[in-house]
Amino acid sequence: MSRNKELGRKIRLMKKVKQNRRVPGWVMMRTARKVTQNPLRRNWRRGNLKI
């Protein structure tokens, strides 16, 4: 991907980066470990972004 990106694409990429994090520990404690995995997790090589 090129170094110079449009602002809209950059914002969408940043949103996907933020979504690709693990569930915080305090969320697991608050939900009594019912929520332990993030369904939006994606591997950078295997998952394709449709942006």
Swiss-Prot record:
GO molecular function annotation: structural constituent of ribosome
Keyword set, alphabetical order: Ribonucleoprotein, Ribosomal protein
Pfam families, sorted: Ribosomal_L39
Segments passing through the bilayer: none
Gene Ontology annotations of biological process type: translation
Gene Ontology terms: cellular component: ribonucleoprotein complex; ribosome
Keyword Ribosomal protein: yes
InterPro entries: Ribosomal_eL39, Ribosomal_eL39_CS, Ribosomal_eL39_dom_sf
Coiled-coil ranges (or none): none
Family: Belongs to the eukaryotic ribosomal protein eL39 family.
Cited HAMAP family: Ribosomal_eL39
Protein name: Large ribosomal subunit protein eL39
